[in-house]
């Protein structure tokens, strides 16, 4: 993957970001090239070793038209049954989807969370905080990627 200063990327654990600069950092006596990245959804900046980009699952941000096309599925299918036997299995499914770090995984997270929320509401049960957090994170990741793709900053 060919990245440079100004590239728009998606970092699985942090979300969408811009590569602000490339710099050399000495760590434990070893000098390495790093990308300094500005996150869309946080005031923090992170440094990522250039050599580890692919290992970390960092990928280029999709084009905004592609993102909009892909999220249209949520209009037709806002929820989907995760078919898990228990809540721990569901959390494991969420972890697997986070590892993929692609847009389709974020959409699937939203569908699963919507399904669980609706089912629990019908059953008169509380909605676990985990479901709300997963839903918020997936939505924020999609909105962040769309904003970075379009060159817009979130306020």
Language-model regions, residue ranges each:
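Charge/polar-rich, low-complexity and marginally structured segments
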Residues: 51-155
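A positional/architectural concept
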Residues: 1-56
